[in-house]
Amino acid sequence: ESRGAPFTVLFEGPADEALARRIVERLESAYWRVGGALTAYPAKPISVVLYTTEQFRDVTRLPEWTAAAYDGRIRMPVRGALEQIDRLDRVLCHEFVHAVVAMLGGRNVPTWLNEGLASVFEAKDTADAERLLARTSARPTLQELHGSFFGPPAGDAAIAYALSTRAVQRMIDLRGAPAVVQLLQDLARGGDFAAAFQQRISMRYEDFQSMVARQ
């Protein structure tokens, strides 16, 4: 258990305390970086379940292309994780952002906003997302991405993540991260998404969707 930022590490499989310490250190880095940008920090400890064997996919039932999951706990496979430190940092940051979104927005946050925010903060920039979008003209609307991404095949899901990344980056460019936080808080109070979006981003949701689709 970390004595700094609120993380508790559990194991599914053989325990590895040295690995747990390294992962908590990297989570704490994400905690301060993301928390500082959003001025929001989880008040309750976050449990992190590390799958040290091949049990991760059996337990979470996620598609093969997923790297980890957040369902109230951060869950991730860790075999060989320290051999890919950059990727480990990105995955941990991504899932930590999901924990922050859950705290701020509750259950009413569209998937594209949740995943887009996590993707923006995990990466140094959005260049990879833009390169992927430049190679395809078949893109879903943001309205179509309010639900789970787990239905499409991996290629379609990659486009969904890229479009979500672009959309959230545009929101931040337009009104800043605090406006996104306020939108999440509106949703936690049960606010209508389109109305809350227009109030916080100062743009109709329909117009924003068109802007994101044509860029």
Can you annotate each of these PLM segments?
Residues 142-215:
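Pan-zinc metallopeptidase signature
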Residues 134-137:
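Scaffold signal of the M16-like zinc-metallopeptidase fold and its non-catalytic homologs
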Residues 2-110, 124-129, 139, 146-150, ...:
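Juxtacatalytic substrate-recognition/specificity segment
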Residues 100, 104, 121-124, 171-175, ...:
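Generic structural signal for hydrophobic core residues of well-folded globular domains
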Residues 67-69, 116, 164:
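Glycine-centered structural positions embedded in regular secondary structure
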